[in-house]
């Protein structure tokens, strides 16, 4: 398999720190809520949670009153093919429709809540931070990384295809994750 050459050039004002160790640099989270959006990642504002009327805005505004700070919940927008609900929650690995955000948060995102059952996710996911308005390097490198992941997964017959491989790996873009020492941070979620 021939790798695709990355044609990215980053602004000199935004270098990548190649010396800082990556292992165990992410803060632990209790849950990660991923919210599909039709807005292309190239159009996401720097702070997606401040977009009035958006689902991520509603989740973010209720976080303090609905969640336990001892059990941190990360909330992100995603751009992904064929979402199966309003939100995808890990490590629960479930898609949910969320008619009442506050009720969903206290039931599904707290350790003592009474969760509503969702639809079991059947796919693995690779999400790449492509939030250009937050970090231009991510906006530049994410499309290249996505192409490479899709290229390799297609070659290995693992890439999602609605007709041919409905349980395949989906590759998508996620809003800002990680610090700014790196660019194009990659999240992998197994279906197990």
Which ranges hold each PLM region?
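Histidine/cysteine-enriched polar flanking segments
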Residues: 1-192
